[in-house]
Design a protein with these regions (language model features):
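Short beta->alpha connector loops at strand-helix junctions that form conserved
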Residues: 42, 165, 265-266, 284-287, ...
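Extended hydrophobic-aromatic, low-complexity segments
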Residues: 203, 235-236, 271-276, 283, ...
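Nucleotide-sugar-dependent glycosyltransferase catalytic domains
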Residues: 1-221, 232-238, 312-313, 326-327, ...
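Hydrophobic beta-strand scaffold residues
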Residues: 37-38, 224, 281, 304
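A short acidic/histidine/glycine-rich donor-binding loop in glycosyltransferase catalytic cores
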Residues: 241, 281, 299-316
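C-terminal "capping" alpha-helix adjacent to the active site of nucleotide-linked donor transferases
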Residues: 313-338
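A donor-sugar binding/catalytic signature common to diverse glycosyltransferases
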Residues: 18, 246-297
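Short internal beta-strands
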Residues: 223-229
Length: 374
């Protein structure tokens, strides 16, 4: 370890860049190497519990705790819209608990670092790193993989948080151009269903998928392009439901005028692509930031959030899911529905921002150049 550090310390650095959400360690290394210009680049959102390290109390904001968001939070007075509601008070309490737990984890990390240096003496002449909280505060900018126009209404604007969501979409170009017209032999309505590459079947079991396919078959004017690793019922209408276990050309499908709906886990990359494409969503999250982002979709009015109710036997309540999905799909397939109108307006706003301020990649590189003076 000493030899590695000695080699690293002889190099010249302009800046250090890493992701803080899950790996604080690199920022301690940056400090030990004397790197003052540090940047945090997150593949996800800016976590609400990290606001406390910027001096912002998330409990005072109408923002759901990362894992606490549920369907309906933004649809009635029993949810987060009403600051007198039980749900609002519960969310505030959970935000407080999450804040304290993160602070506790950081303090334990600090103690571990202290013990490591003083009890084991694994690196000579190297001072103990600053606390994790201080390392976070030293970060010049936090770049997050989220569009600026796709965040909760009360999520605070901070000069330290820069939104570069869409950087890959803009480089690919297909979703920032005019929508592609469908050919005469193509269906007037295409529905895309895919739950990403990590867990292609999401949190579904066979019964819940069968319920979903039953609803698909009620809309015979549409073609449903489905990726579910062939984890499907034995009998279904293959004329309107195309199932594959291969990765679908998601951007290309979303770019078409006849694509009316995206049924997704609503991970950040899929959500961003849907927004740039102007395609409304039915969100059925499974893990990670998907619950938080599904709630965001609901608040923005660009889709519907359905949560799978899992029993103690690890089975989905297929009857409840079937009813929820039927209601959501029927709403989405109404001509000129409000979700389509709202996401069209959001797409227009994002593309106008791109035209006026330039690609996110340029903004990202320009901001780093400004900090390092090059």
């Amino acid at each position: 370890m000493v030899e590695v550090f000695d080699w690293l310390s002889k190099q010249v650095y302009s800046f250090g860049i890493a992701e803080f959400n899950h790996m604080e360690g690199p920022f301690a290394v940056f400090e030990a190497l004397g790197i003052e210009n540090t940047f945090d680049v997150s593949a996800s959102i800016f976590y609400p519990e990290h606001l406390q390290f910027l001096g912002i109390d998330v409990k005072l904001l109408n923002v759901p705790e990362f894992k606490f968001a549920i369907p309906g939070d933004w649809l009635n007075n029993e949810g987060l819209l009403n600051k007198e509601s039980k749900r609002y008070r519960e969310n505030s309490l959970v935000n407080e608990v999450t804040n304290r737990n993160l602070a506790l984890i950081h303090s334990r990390t600090d103690l571990f670092a202290f013990d490591s240096f003083y009890n084991e003496g694994n690196v000579k002449d190297l001072r103990v790193p600053s606390s994790v909280d201080l390392l976070f505060k030293k970060v010049k900018f936090h770049f997050v993989n989220q569009p600026f126009h796709a965040k909760f209404k009360e999520f605070p604007i901070s000069e330290n948080i820069l939104y570069i969501g869409g950087i890959l979409v803009e480089q690919n170009k297909i979703l920032i151009e005019e929508k592609v017209k469908a050919n005469d032999n193509e269906p007037i309505c295409v529905i895309l269903l895919t739950f990403g590459t990590v867990n292609p079947i999401g949190g579904f079991d066979l019964k819940s998928i069968a319920k979903m396919f039953e609803e698909f078959e009620k809309h015979s004017h549409c073609l449903f392009k489905v990726r579910l690793n062939k984890f499907v019922p034995e009998n279904y209408n293959i004329n309107i439901i195309e199932v594959t276990d291969e990765i679908l050309p998601q951007k290309e499908i979303l770019s078409k005028e006849n694509t009316k709906l995206f049924i997704s886990h609503c991970g950040l990359n899929s959500l961003t692509e849907a927004i740039y494409a102007g395609v409304p969503l039915i969100c059925i999250p499974c893990n990670g930031d998907q619950f938080y982002l599904s709630s965001l979709v609901e608040q923005m009015g660009i889709g519907i959030y359905i949560k799978l109710n899992i029993s103690n036997q690890n089975e989905v309540d297929s009857e409840v899911f079937g009813a929820d999905f039927q209601n959501a799909l029927d709403k989405m397939l109404i001509d000129s529905n409000i979700y389509q109108k709202t996401i069209n307006e959001l797409r227009t706003k994002i593309l106008l921002d791109l035209e006026e301020n330039g690609p996110k990649k340029n903004i990202f590189l320009k901001k780093i150049s400004e900090v390092i003076g090059k």
